[in-house]
């Protein structure tokens, strides 16, 4: 069953500059020409033979002479796959097996994401959100936060620091509002207490004013009646 070519390999081949290489022309049949050098005498003797896309199992088999352009495609694909294998820590044998199968190169990780993919970025955001919650960021000191951020990306570190600063400012503003509200309630309670005291004092002043008027009226009657007139015992009632 024929396997489709790897999109990653084809993209690399499309970006590969072939103009700097000379295409080897094969002599046509029946035309005399210089003998063609075998692959054993070329610099590519260490490269395994090029497999066909329709027969991936023929990598190690001996094949006939191929056109130069197909060899360049094969070398570009092999170099790209082997370079990806070395970057991922794969051995040359594993890279060759991946090349034979024409499958995507796996990436080490808990979910097998590709580097820089949206899935990997989303998983990293989730892990950091679980590790650095809002409460943890607020209670954490700057030194502790810098120590915890070692190994994180620069963008993630800046985002978490900005998040902590925002939470700190928000908490400070909320604390100020709560303090002002508490002071306002205290002042309103004090105002109500003083108003009640003022009303009580006004009532007391009114009572004293009535008593003053009563005593003044009695004094006026005593003054108008003159000395020795009548029995003054009624003044003490």
UniProtKB/Swiss-Prot annotation:
GO terms for biological process: positive regulation of gene expression; positive regulation of transcription by RNA polymerase II; regulation of transcription by RNA polymerase II; retinal rod cell development; visual perception. Changing residue 122 to E: In RP27; uncertain significance; alters phosphorylation; no effect on subcellular localization; no effect on transcriptional coactivator activity. Pfam families: bZIP_Maf (PF03131), Maf_N (PF08383). GO terms for molecular function: DNA binding; DNA-binding transcription activator activity, RNA polymerase II-specific; DNA-binding transcription factor activity, RNA polymerase II-specific; leucine zipper domain binding; promoter-specific chromatin binding; RNA polymerase II cis-regulatory region sequence-specific DNA binding; sequence-specific double-stranded DNA binding. CDD domains: bZIP_Maf_large (cd14718). Residues 30-93 are annotated as: Minimal transactivation domain (MTD). One of its GO terms (cellular component) is cytosol. Phosphorylated. InterPro entries: bZIP, bZIP_Maf, bZIP_sf, Maf_TF_N, TF_DNA-bd_sf, Transcription_factor_Maf_fam. The keyword Ubl conjugation applies. Residues 159-222 form the bZIP domain. Changing residue 76 to V: In RDCP; uncertain significance; alters phosphorylation; no effect on subcellular localization; no effect on transcriptional coactivator activity. Changing residue 50 to T: In RP27; decreases phosphorylation; no effect on subcellular localization; increased transactivational activity; increased transcriptional coactivator activity. Keywords: Activator, Cytoplasm, Developmental protein, Disease variant, DNA-binding, Isopeptide bond, Nucleus, Retinitis pigmentosa, Sensory transduction, Transcription, Transcription regulation, Ubl conjugation, Vision. Belongs to the bZIP family. It is linked to Retinitis pigmentosa 27: A retinal dystrophy belonging to the group of pigmentary retinopathies. Retinitis pigmentosa is characterized by retinal pigment deposits visible on fundus examination and primary loss of rod photoreceptor cells followed by secondary loss of cone photoreceptors. Patients typically have night vision blindness and loss of midperipheral visual field. As their condition progresses, they lose their far peripheral visual field and eventually central vision as well. Retinal degeneration autosomal recessive clumped pigment type: A retinopathy characterized by night blindness since early childhood, consistent with a severe reduction in rod function. Color vision is normal although there is a relatively enhanced function of short-wavelength-sensitive cones in the macula. Signs of retinal degeneration and clusters of clumped pigment deposits in the peripheral fundus at the level of the retinal pigment epithelium are present. Acts as a transcriptional activator which regulates the expression of several rod-specific genes, including RHO and PDE6B. Also functions as a transcriptional coactivator, stimulating transcription mediated by the transcription factor CRX and NR2E3. Binds to the rhodopsin promoter in a sequence-specific manner. PANTHER family: NEURAL RETINA-SPECIFIC LEUCINE ZIPPER PROTEIN, TRANSCRIPTION FACTOR MAF. This is Neural retina-specific leucine zipper protein. It comes from Homo sapiens (Human). The gene is NRL.
């Amino acid at each position: 069953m024929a396997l489709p070519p790897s999109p990653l390999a084809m993209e690399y081949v499309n970006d590969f500059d072939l103009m700097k290489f000379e295409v080897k022309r094969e002599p046509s049949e029946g035309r005399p020409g210089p003998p063609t050098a075998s692959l054993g005498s070329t610099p590519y003797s260490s490269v395994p033979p090029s497999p066909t896309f329709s027969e991936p199992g023929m990598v190690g088999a001996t094949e006939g002479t191929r056109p130069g352009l197909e060899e360049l495609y094969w070398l570009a694909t092999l170099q790209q796959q082997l370079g990806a294998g070395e970057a991922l820590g794969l051995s040359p044998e594993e890279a060759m097996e991946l090349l034979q199968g024409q499958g995507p190169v796996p990436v080490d990780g808990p979910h097998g994401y590709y580097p820089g993919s949206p899935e990997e970025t989303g998983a990293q955001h989730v892990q950091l959100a679980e590790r650095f919650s809002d409460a943890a960021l607020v209670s954490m000191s700057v030194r502790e936060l810098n120590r915890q951020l070692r190994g994180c990306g620069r963008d993630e570190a800046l985002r978490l620091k900005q998040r902590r600063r925002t939470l700190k400012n928000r908490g400070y503003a909320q604390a100020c509002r709560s303090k002002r509200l508490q002071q306002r309630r205290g002042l309103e309670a004090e105002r109500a207490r003083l108003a009640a005291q003022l009303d009580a004092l006004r009532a007391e002043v009114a009572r004293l004013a009535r008593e003053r008027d009563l005593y003044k009226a009695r004094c006026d009657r005593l003054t108008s009646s003159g000395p020795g007139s009548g029995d003054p015992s009624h003044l003490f009632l």
